[in-house]
Curated annotation (Swiss-Prot):
Keywords: Glycoprotein, Membrane, Transmembrane, Transmembrane helix. Glycans are attached at N296, N664, N723. Its main location: membrane. Residues 346-358 have a biased composition (Low complexity). Residues 327-337 have a biased composition (Basic residues). This is Protein PHTF2. The keyword Ribosomal protein does not apply. It comes from Gallus gallus. It comes from the Eukaryota. PANTHER family: PROTEIN PHTF2, PUTATIVE HOMEODOMAIN TRANSCRIPTION FACTOR PHTF. The chain crosses the membrane at residues 98-118, 126-146, 464-484, 520-540, 601-621, 635-655, 727-747. Residues 6-153 form the PHTF domain. The lineage of its organism: Eukaryota, Metazoa, Chordata, Craniata, Vertebrata. Residues 182-194 have a biased composition (Polar residues).
């Protein structure tokens, strides 16, 4: 229905637009329709030695983004929390098995608490907010988690292995046909599979819990899917590279599949000539046989694994098909200077060697995110430099699977142009490093300098003060109902005269009713657990902000000899244009390093929750400030407001300090002074130093133009919505202060 309305709207727009057209506009439209079809074209290359404004701004280092809007993600998060058992597969894939069972127990306990509250007949002093409060917090946490994992949306596996193989084979053939037609590849086939699976499956309550038990204890696909999701990388153009660590079973099956594939395509002789290779790639029978072998092996492997693992293994087998065919190439083919007639017509060996080198390094090194990233970047930078001339010419008869692998490789899509433009032999700067008391010079690239900074940040031992503070607040909020009932029932002097049994009866709000006691205990457990989870997320965000500040501090120490030696980082001066370029690249990369959007979601949720709590408190104070503290939930709101405000102040302090470190133009001004000092000592280099000085001045102006002040909320807020929120909240605070102090006070001012 929506598509028909859209088509009708477009048709009517064109219809009424035709009445306004003149002759010149029609001729222009005819030329626009022709486009570039009749234009002569020749091969061109992007200048690798130039920089874009995206590089300085940081948007060149793309981060993962969700495909759905935040309203859809909020709705999905609420639905997945309310119907938690029915979405057990999704929760198993985006969390671990232990966390899933913990959340399931909390969900069942909360349901039991609501049922007990509704069925309790005896009079009790338990307010409704004590039972309903954890539900709102559970919905908030579920929504936040759904927005965090929205960039990695796993798809449930089909019901049977035969249907899975059939649909995977169909999807593979459709992808090949789309590749041959030159059209863009989408996930329509997979989406259709998921939709048909979701609509054709109906569960009873007993079947749901039986499937939960079976999935948690007897299926390993969710664990593998989680590993592949956690290790995947995605950019703005929708690329997903699943490089998760495989279990022993999947690794053995993949190795066997690779051995069988290599036996099929292995030549009878030890070496092939270039002519033989060209004939082999040009033979249609060999092309079809190889593709059929890859498809069969991928179907065989994926029939026993989960969807994400099967996808990874299929990509692995496809890499092996290209690598096994090309690996007997002689070493002189990779030299930069060779005759054109000896040049192979395929550019996939670079991608194959890059992928295999990354897999080999992943199997031997420890599990570290930093090492994984830098190994990938270093291997692919070397691979790119060795295969630059080889990838200039592409074969029109390339294997579609290999061409898809080559096209989907993120290291060949210029997502990191400043890395790929670096030649390891040329794009280096002379930096000073300290080994004890010895000062030595070394030629270092951007990757090596940033790697040393990251190692220094990772070696930093974070404090646990805010974690302890979160634990204390969780316990206080959990015990608040008991303390409030004791304070309302008895005076402090009378409490000492009562026995422990009477105090417990008063604190639990019942005279021994087992249903009420169970409800209070369950609410206490659920409340403490959910509040602890929320403050745990805030502690994770606080640590991330602290790491960003450390990145900024160490980056500022690079151009200071004393601070660089103290911080054990390299030291170099901005005395050349190349040094300035690498300094700007390093600055942008470090600003984008680490969690970005996920942490912004947590901080934004805390910010919006604080605004809501402050607004409710102000409304309660304006409505009934005489009896404000006589309500249990008002005490909880005050505690929430104080604790969240402390965390937000911490975020504001760290974020503002980080922005100040990166926007510190005193470094560039100091380097300009050093250039003038160098001009005085070396008049013969005055022209060169003047050029560098002018570039420094331009860099200073550019940073001032692009840098923006720190924002507490990570989500983009409409200016109108921001002004409305500011007016409502600050007006409420102004009203409270004016009512309590007795004079008018305005704290807000609308800004355009």
């Amino acid at each position: 229905m929506a598509s028909k309305v859209t088509d009708a709207r477009d048709w009517y727009q064109k219809k009424i637009g035709a009445y306004d057209q003149q002759i010149w506009e029609k001729s222009v439209e005819q030329r626009e329709i022709k486009g570039l079809r009749n234009k002569p074209k020749k091969t061109g290359h992007v200048k690798p030695d130039l920089i874009d404004v995206d590089l300085v701004r940081g948007s060149a280092f793309a981060k993962a983004k969700p495909e759905s809007p935040w309203t859809s993600l909020t709705r999905k998060g609420i639905v997945r929390v309310v119907f938690f058992p029915f979405f057990y597969r999704w929760w198993l894939q985006v969390t671990s098995r232990v966390i899933f069972f913990w959340l399931l127990v909390l969900y069942l306990l909360q349901v039991a608490a609501v049922v007990l509250f509704c069925t309790a007949q005896s009079p009790h002093n338990i307010p409704l907010t004590e039972v309903i409060g954890p539900i709102w917090l559970m919905l908030l946490l579920g929504t936040v988690h759904c927005q965090i994992v929205s960039t990695r949306t796993p798809k449930p596996p089909p019901s049977t292995g035969v249907k899975r193989r059939r649909k995977l084979r169909k999807a593979a053939h459709l992808e090949v046909h789309r590749e041959g037609d030159g059209s863009s590849t989408t996930d329509n086939t997979q989406e259709g599979t998921v939709q048909s699976y979701g609509t054709s499956t109906s569960y009873s309550i007993g079947a749901v819990f039986r499937d939960i038990w079976h999935a948690a204890f007897f299926l390993s696909g969710s664990k593998k899917a989680k590993n592949s999701i956690d290790k995947s990388t995605e950019t703005d153009n929708g690329y997903v590279s699943l490089e998760g660590k495989k279990t022993g079973k999947s690794s053995e099956e993949c190795a066997q599949a690779q051995e069988r594939l290599c036996e099929v395509i292995k030549p009878e002789e030890s070496g092939w000539s270039t002519t033989t290779m060209r004939e082999t790639f040009g033979t249609p029978s060999h092309h079809k046989e190889t593709h059929r072998t890859v498809t069969n092996l991928s179907d065989e492997v994926s029939s026993e694994e989960g969807p994400e693992t099967g996808y990874s293994l299929r990509r692995n087998v496809e890499r092996t098909s290209s690598d096994g065919t090309l690996r007997n190439r002689k070493s002189h083919h990779y030299k930069k200077h060779y005759p054109l007639e000896d040049t192979p017509k395929s550019g996939t060996s670079c991608s194959s060697r890059c992928s295999s080198s990354r897999q080999d390094s992943e199997s031997t090194r420890p599990e570290s995110e930093t090492e994984d990233v830098w190994e990938d970047l270093l291997h692919c930078a070397e691979c790119h430099s060795s295969c630059t001339s080889e990838t200039d010419v592409e074969s029109p008869q390339m294997n579609p699977c290999v061409k898809k692998e080559y096209r989907d490789d993120p290291f060949h899509q210029s997502h990191l142009p400043w890395i790929h433009s670096l030649n390891p032999g040329l794009e280096k700067i002379s930096a000073i490093v300290w080994e004890g008391n010895d000062c030595k010079k070394a030629d270092m690239s951007v990757l090596e300098i940033s790697g040393m900074i990251m190692n220094r940040v990772n070696s930093y031992i974070p404090g646990i003060g805010y974690q302890i503070f979160g634990n204390i607040i969780s316990l206080i909020l959990g015990l608040m109902p008991f303390v409030f009932r004791l304070s309302q029932a008895k005076d402090l002097e009378q409490l000492a005269a009562h026995s422990a049994t009477e105090l417990c009866i008063t604190a639990f709000g019942s005279n021994g009713d087992i249903l009420v006691l169970s409800m209070v205990v369950i609410s206490f457990v659920v409340r403490v657990s959910l509040v602890w989870i929320f403050f745990f997320l805030l502690c994770v965000a606080e640590r991330t902000y602290k790491q960003r500040l450390l990145f900024a501090k160490l980056f500022g120490h690079l151009t200071s000899a004393r601070r660089a030696r103290k911080s054990e980082v390299p030291h170099f001066r901005l005395k050349k244009v190349q040094n300035i370029k690498m300094w700007l690249s390093l600055r942008s990369y470090l600003k984008r390093r680490g969690p970005q959007r996920s942490v912004d979601v947590i901080v934004s949720s805390a910010f919006l929750l604080t605004i809501s709590v402050v607004f409710i408190c102000c409304a309660q104070l304006l409505h009934m400030h005489e009896i404000f503290l006589d309500c249990h939930y008002n005490w909880e709101l005050v505690i929430w407001c104080i604790s969240l405000t402390l965390f937000l102040l911490r975020f504001v302090t760290l974020g503002s300090e980080t922005s100040k470190k990166y926007s510190n133009t005193s470094i560039l001004l100091t380097e300009q002074i050093n250039l003038y000092l160098k001009m005085e000592k070396k008049p013969n280099k005055k022209e060169e130093l003047t050029l560098v000085n002018n570039v420094l001045k331009l860099a200073t102006k550019l940073l001032k133009e692009l840098d923006s002040p720190f924002r507490l909320y990570g989500l983009t807020m409409n200016p109108l919505l921001y002004n409305i929120t500011q007016v409502v909240i600050l007006s409420a605070v102004s009203g409270v202060i004016s009512d309590l102090l007795g004079f008018n006070l305005k704290l807000w001012k609308i800004k355009s």
